[in-house]
Amino acid sequence: MRDTLAMTSALTGRAPGSPILPLAVRDLVLRFGDTAVLDGVTLDLGPAGCTVVMGPNGSGKSLLLKLLHGLMRPTSGTIDWAGRAPAEVTARQALVFQKPVLLRRSVAANIDFVLKARGGDRARRAALLDHVGLAHKAGQPARLLSGGEAQRLALARALATDPEVLFLDEPTASLDPASVLAIEAIVGAARARGTRIVFVTHDIGQARRMADDVVFLHRGRVAEHGPAAGFFPEPQSAAARDYLNGRIVV
C-alpha cells in the first residue's frame, strides 16, 4: 500500500484554526456508582508521536480514550485541549474501535458519507481507498469485507476527516498477522504526516513497534508514563514489570 495521502495535494483537508495540542489531563476521575474506574489520572501529551496505552484488563484504558475523545464525561477532573472549545476539539479527532463501525453500504459509500460533511470529492475518496488497499473493492458491499479489510475501511473513514488526533482502541486485537502489519503501516504513515496517535493495545510486540511513549494504567491510575526507549527495557513500576514479564497483574 502506497502512502497516497502524502502524495496527493487534494487531501489537505484538516480543519482550520489553532492546534488542539498539547493536551493536559488533571485529576481525572470516572465513577460508576461507588467504584472509581479511573482514579486521579494526570497526563500530558505533546503535539507529535504515538502514545501507546497499556495495562491489565479493567485498568481503564478504553474508558480513558472515550473520555479524551468526548464520548463520555468524567465525574471530576479536567481535560484541556490547548484551551479549545469541546466542539472544535471533536471536529479534529477520530476514534477507531476494535470492532469496525461501518455503514451497510458499499465500500465507497462509507467514505463518501464522511467526505460529504467535509466537502471532499472523489479524488480524495479514491486516494483514501488506494492508501488502505481497497480501491479494487470500492463498489463491493462493506459487509462482505474480511475482518482486516473492514478495519482498514474504518481507518480510511477516520482519515477522511484528516484528524489532528487519532484514537485507536485495540484495532488489531482479532486480526491475523498480515492484517495487523497492514494496519500498523497505515497508522505509521498517519503519524509520519503529523497526526497525533493514541493507541490502546495488549500486544507488547506491537507496543514496541509503535510507541514513542507509553502510558501504563493500573487500577485506574497512571502507574508509569515515559519514553518507550526506557519503559520496555527498564520499567519503573512493579505492575509494569510484572505485565511485561507475562505475570498476572492484580
Describe the predicted segments one by one.
Residues 201-202:
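H-loop/switch region of ABC-family ATPase nucleotide-binding domains
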Residues 122-137:
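Conserved ABC ATPase "signature" region
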Residues 141-145, 149:
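Conserved ABC ATPase signature
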Residues 207-209:
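A short, surface-exposed alpha-helical micro-motif characterized by mixed small hydrophobic
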Residues 166-169:
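Catalytic Walker B motif of ABC-type/P-loop ATPase nucleotide-binding domains
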Residues 69:
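Helix-to-loop junction immediately C-terminal to a conserved catalytic motif
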